[in-house]
Amino acid sequence: MEKDHLVEEEKKDKVESEKPEEGVTVPKVESNDDIHQTDTPKVDSTTSEGKLKDPVAVERPSINSTNTSSSGGFGNTVNDLSQPSTRPVTTAETSTNSNLPWDGNQANRNLNSQSYDLRVHLLKSLGIEDISRIDIADNKLLERFFSLHIEREQKEIEKLKTKNLEKLELIVDKFVSNEKFTNDTLNKLLELISSKSIDSHDLLGSSSIQLKRTEHSPNRLMSPRGHKRYKSEIPTVPETQYSHINYNIHGQPVNMVYHQAYQQVTPQTYYVPQGNQAWHQGSYTQGNRATFQPPSLANSNINNSEDVKLQEGVKVEPSGRARQRSSTSLGASLSTSNSTSNLSNTMKAATANEGKDTGSNDGHHTGSYGASNASNVMPSQVNNPNYMTYGSVRGGPYVMVQQPPGQQMATQYIPAGNQGFYQSVVPNQGHMNGMVASSQGYQANTPQPATSDNMVMLGNQYRGNETLHQDATPSLSSSTSQKRQGHRRTQSANVVLSTGRSPNRMNMQRQVNFLIHTPKHPPPT
């Protein structure tokens, strides 16, 4: 029963809503068929003044109805939806709707702003300015536009090619018609064109100058001492040059005969010819000694000045029986070295004629010893088969004789003049502390064959069977111990070479620099 009652009330409400109210004009709504048949829609709505509001106004159905039911409430919602209402649409609304890319296309509204702007920019670059009538969301449409644009560019390129060919033909015709144009000029033009093309290809090529690249190992970069030198980077001394080099207690190379701390003098070597050989037939290592004329034995001149320079390397090579006689006599005279009578008499005889004939000493200035002076010190040594090294160090000359392995002899110092036999052979006792060979400091041991290993060194180190007295030369152990006293981490370690080995057999050793880390001075972290 209640349902029937509700249905009757709804029917009554429908009838009342269909009746027109007084003062309200109901607009006539045309069907869709009428709208398609006529181009311009009919406008029935007027304003309260009786004039047309907008001549272009179009009535459209509105979903929300302004009419309310008499009963109030929401019972009239169905009638509101069923009855379409019209409202005028102005030109302002149509202009705002026309700003959209394609009015009525939902796909354009779903595009992102960035893609939309990009597509608009591309279309404008192709020459399309009015984009309002184009569906930008359609990808196929964009591809068509781009294909058309590419075709246009290709046509323009072909036009340029044809124009260039026409100009080239005209230029070639002019050159051919000219009499001055020959094959040589044509070849030159072709060479220029080919060279330009090659240069253009080689612009990015590698340069002819190869730069040296410094290779840094990761160990060097990670080390706290980045300036550390490796073994391969340190220059080595050849084996042939090492025989002339000696090392002191500090590990520094010094001259074997002359100490580095006082003065270094370049040694000079002379060649003494054989007994039967003329002096001009001998070979000389120094060019300025080519005119050297040795004085005779009677005209020997031994200078005792303090400015005498060092000379060494006299080589005597006699032959025959004189070799045996001289070797035996020289060995006998030198073996009795402890008694100075024989040598002193020899020196007196040699120096008796001092200053008699100075003009025969050609090629030498006053105060220097020549090869003849060394040979005149001991007359028996002129035809000696041995190697005789001589020189003088501010006190007088010395002679170092080396015997072949078959014979035995001793090596002696031979001073000049009236000086003592073993008196002050080393220069300047103040500079050479403890490096003086006194008369009590020389001891002749058992003779031994003098070879290249048994060599005389003045004051610094003595290599051979003959040894100096302990009072004359201080031991290396005491000197090194004094140097190592108060050793701190800032000082480098000293490498002392062995004194019992010859320099030829000695291995190459370098100064070793390292830090000693203690708990008080730990290594860097």
Curated annotation (Swiss-Prot):
<comment type="similarity">
    <text>Belongs to the POG1 family.</text>
</comment>
<keyword id="KW-0131">Cell cycle</keyword>
<keyword id="KW-0010">Activator</keyword>
<keyword id="KW-0805">Transcription regulation</keyword>
<dbReference type="GO" id="GO:0005634">
    <property type="term" value="C:nucleus"/>
</dbReference>
<comment type="function">
    <text>Transcriptional activator which promotes cell cycle recovery, after pheromone induced G1 arrest. May also be involved in stress-resistance.</text>
</comment>
<keyword id="KW-0132">Cell division</keyword>
<feature type="compositionally biased region" description="Basic and acidic residues">
    <location>
        <begin position="354"/>
        <end position="365"/>
    </location>
</feature>
<feature type="compositionally biased region" description="Low complexity">
    <location>
        <begin position="326"/>
        <end position="346"/>
    </location>
</feature>
<feature type="region of interest" description="Disordered">
    <location>
        <begin position="1"/>
        <end position="108"/>
    </location>
</feature>
<feature type="region of interest" description="Disordered">
    <location>
        <begin position="467"/>
        <end position="506"/>
    </location>
</feature>
<feature type="compositionally biased region" description="Low complexity">
    <location>
        <begin position="62"/>
        <end position="71"/>
    </location>
</feature>
<keyword id="KW-0539">Nucleus</keyword>
<protein>
    <recommendedName>
        <fullName>Transcriptional activator POG1</fullName>
    </recommendedName>
</protein>
<keyword id="KW-0804">Transcription</keyword>
<feature type="compositionally biased region" description="Polar residues">
    <location>
        <begin position="491"/>
        <end position="506"/>
    </location>
</feature>
<feature type="compositionally biased region" description="Polar residues">
    <location>
        <begin position="285"/>
        <end position="305"/>
    </location>
</feature>
<dbReference type="GO" id="GO:0051301">
    <property type="term" value="P:cell division"/>
</dbReference>
<feature type="compositionally biased region" description="Basic and acidic residues">
    <location>
        <begin position="30"/>
        <end position="42"/>
    </location>
</feature>
<feature type="compositionally biased region" description="Polar residues">
    <location>
        <begin position="78"/>
        <end position="108"/>
    </location>
</feature>
<feature type="compositionally biased region" description="Polar residues">
    <location>
        <begin position="470"/>
        <end position="483"/>
    </location>
</feature>
<feature type="compositionally biased region" description="Basic and acidic residues">
    <location>
        <begin position="306"/>
        <end position="320"/>
    </location>
</feature>
<keyword id="KW-0346">Stress response</keyword>
<keyword id="KW-0498">Mitosis</keyword>
<feature type="region of interest" description="Disordered">
    <location>
        <begin position="285"/>
        <end position="376"/>
    </location>
</feature>
<feature type="compositionally biased region" description="Basic and acidic residues">
    <location>
        <begin position="1"/>
        <end position="22"/>
    </location>
</feature>
